[in-house]
Amino acid sequence: MTFLPELGQNIRFARKKQFPRDNMKAFSLRVGISRATYQKMEKGDLSVSLKHYYQAAKLLRVENDFTRLFLLKESLFDD
């Protein structure tokens, strides 16, 4: 099971909220990728580079959340 379809839905929601006049083509130009690549991102296609997801996250101002993907919280039991 993959989380990318949900990620794609989140990207689509954020695009429509922050750039309500942008269709997929207009937003893909903002990100610097082709419409076809962006369409794959919204579908959760595994072939899309993580770099493109980060570019979209940066444009949508959620890159800080993106960079925390693998951040481990410190435990009281850690040295």
Protein language model annotation of sequence segments:
Residues M1-P20, L69:
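A short, Lys/Arg-rich alpha-helix, primarily the initiator
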Residues D22-M24, L50-Y53:
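Helix-turn-helix DNA-binding elements, focusing on the entry/boundary residues of the two helices
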